[in-house]
Each structure stands twice: as structure tokens, then as C-alpha cells.
Design a protein with these regions (language model features):
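ABC transporter nucleotide-binding domains
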Residues: 1-177
Length: 177
């Protein structure tokens, strides 16, 4: 069975006013279909930066060096593309349809001035051919699936109206979308 995700010798550095910060050094791993990989480590050990790199979400001052980053057998390292626009278009498709990340802090990810329903519906509208009504129903179903009580009512609430655990479940629902 072929790897779904393969990362070979990933290194991530950040340029700062104080010099170079080495966030990730020579990390390699593979994930096969139906397999779950947990990345654990101390705070600041590079777990998030590793995954931001794989998903093409690294900050502008970050630099990735990798022998290979493959998703479903295709190179997804930016150097494999003709230009940044082509890379971004490919990654946007992969992120929306094939790969998702559950962020550690939901309040960093959720927009405080947008209703939860709006934030759940947006990725569905961007990455599916469903109508707005179908997207709304799917969002309600996803909320129900992750254990959010009264999802129809919750669609019209803001992130601050949710407990920390419920906000985390909304992020999981978005990843499932």
C-alpha cells in the first residue's frame, strides 16, 4: 500500500530580526490510508510548524527545506511548482477536499465577528457543488455529529457564546467538512 502522505527530511527555519530560528530539523514520516498519526512533543518543539509546512500554511518568514513532501503520490512541496500561484491553487484544493488540520486554539481559528453557521458553511460552499441550503443542512448535520446540542439554534451564535470544548468541536466539524 502506498503512502497517502510522505514527508522526507523536512527542515523549517524562520528569519527574524534576531537571526534564524530553527523550528523543525530533519523530520521524516509517512501516513498510510486509514492510518492515524499523532505528533507529540513539548511546547515549541515544532509540531504545529511541521503540519503548517505540509499544508502550505507557513508564515511568510518561514523557509522549508525538504527532500520530498508527497500527498497521494504527488509532490506538494512549493519547489515542485512553476510558480507560487500554481502552488497555492493546488494546495487550496487539497486543503479543502483531501486534508484538514484541527488547530490547537479554536479562538485563533474562529472569526469572532462571524456566526458559527457562516464559518461552517463557507468551506462547504468553496469546495463542493452543494446549494446554500444543502450546505446549511450539512453544517447542522456536522454539528450534530460532533455533539453540539441544538445545532439549528447554534448556527446563529458567535464563537464567544460557545464553551471552549464546543469551540473545539466546531473546529473538528470544519475539518470533517
Amino acid at each position: 500500500m502506498n503512502e497517502l502522505l510522505k514527508v522526507d527530511h523536512l527542515t523549517v527555519d524562520f528569519s527574524t530580526d534576531q537571526g534564524t530560528v530553527h523550528a523543525v530539523r530533519d523530520v521524516s514520516f509517512s501516513v498510510y490510508p486509514q492510518e492515524v498519526l499523532g505528533i507529540v512533543g513539548e511546547s515549541g518543539s515544532g509540531k504545529s510548524q511541521t503540519m503548517y509546512s505540509v499544508m502550505g500554511l507557513l508564515a511568510d518568514n518561514g523557509k522549508i527545506t525538504a527532500e520530498d513532501i508527497l500527498f497521494d503520490g504527488k509532490k506538494i512541496h512549493e519547489s515542485a511548482f512553476k510558480n507560487h500561484t500554481e502552488y497555492e491553487k493546488t494546495m487550496q484544493h487539497i486543503r479543502g477536499n483531501d486534508m484538514a488540520m484541527i488547530f490547537q486554539d479554536p479562538m485563533t481559528f474562529l472569526n469572532p465577528v462571524l456566526k458559527i453557521g457562516t464559518q461552517l458553511i463557507e468551506p462547504l460552499q468553496n469546495h463542493t457543488k452543494m446549494s446554500k441550503k444543502e450546505c446549511e443542512q450539512k453544517a447542522i448535520d456536522l454539528m450534530r455529529q460532533v455533539g453540539i446540542p441544538s445545532p439549528e439554534k447554534r448556527m446563529n451564535q458567535y464563537p464567544y457564546e460557545f464553551s471552549g470544548g464546543m469551540r473545539q468541536r466546531i473546529i473538528i466539524a470544519m475539518a470533517l467538512a
